Amino acid sequence: AQGDIFINKLKDYLKNHTDPDEIDRTGEIPDQVIKDLGEMGAMGIKIPKEYGGLGLSQTNYSRAAMLLGSHCGNLTALLSAHQSIGVPQPLIVFGTDEQKQKYLPLFAKGNISAFALTEDKVGSDPAKMQTTATPSEDGKTFPITGKKRGRTNGRNATRIVVIPQSPT
């Protein structure tokens, strides 16, 4: 039931407040659209309710992606990269309770996350990456050394998932 309510709300918003042709022409998603999508929960579809997200299932996330894809590919890319390969999903799976409490509410409400994998000489092949994250002597940090070529959602992101090699 909650999934249906969200999908209907998203469908209505897309129809009445977005212009996919204009987004395609300009290559820009209006800031107001990003803000509105965050306020309606579209940035936190799978983020648990306890962290301010909608807490919906993968099925409902897929339904939203299909709806977005049938309306505007750019919005689909923004939301799917943010929630799947950006910060929220890795944080849900691998983050500490403290990290989840600090960051997930921000992403659920509209802060956008980015993803950085691609490198100049190796493309997007993680097995050949040259960027590294080596533990500090005390093991508390992993300083990153290297260079990434681009980042999905980077223009609008407040946090970025960086994919490096590590010795462990």
What name fits each language-model region?
Residues 114-135:
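A gly/ser-rich beta-alpha-beta helix-loop segment of oxidoreductase catalytic cores
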Residues 141, 145-168:
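A short core secondary-structure module
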